[in-house]
């Protein structure tokens, strides 16, 4: 009976440690995903800014030609 208790405690302990490691990795992955999403939004904002600048330059050029 003592052997079974020790085995059960060992299995439970290893399960808790494994679960803890999974939670840490999940948190790290969520942080990486959040950083990537933030970077994508920043790049999209830069792209939109450059596009609007290009459109303004083109309209100024076309306006000066006409």
From Swiss-Prot:
GO biological process per UniProt: defense response to bacterium
GO-annotated cellular components: extracellular region
Keywords on record: Amphibian defense peptide, Antibiotic, Antimicrobial, Cleavage on pair of basic residues, Secreted, Signal
Subcellular location: Secreted
Domain of life: Eukaryota
Signal sequence segment: 1-22
Propeptide: 23-40
Tissue expression summary: Expressed by the skin glands.
Pfam families per the UniProt record, alphabetical: FSAP_sig_propep
SS bonds (residue pairs): none
Keyword Magnesium among UniProt keywords: no
GO molecular function: identical protein binding
Keyword RNA-binding appears in the UniProt entry: no
Free-text function comment from the UniProt entry: Possesses a potent antimicrobial activity against Gram-positive and Gram-negative bacteria. Probably acts by disturbing membrane functions with its amphipathic structure.
Protein name: Dermaseptin PD-3-7
């Amino acid at each position: 009976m003592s052997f079974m208790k020790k085995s059960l405690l060992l299995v439970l302990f290893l399960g808790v440690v494994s679960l803890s490691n999974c939670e840490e990795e999940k948190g790290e992955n969520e942080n990486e995903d959040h950083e990537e999403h933030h970077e994508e939004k920043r790049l999209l904002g830069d792209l939109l800014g450059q596009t609007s600048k290009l459109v303004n330059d083109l309209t100024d050029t076309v306006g000066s030609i006409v």
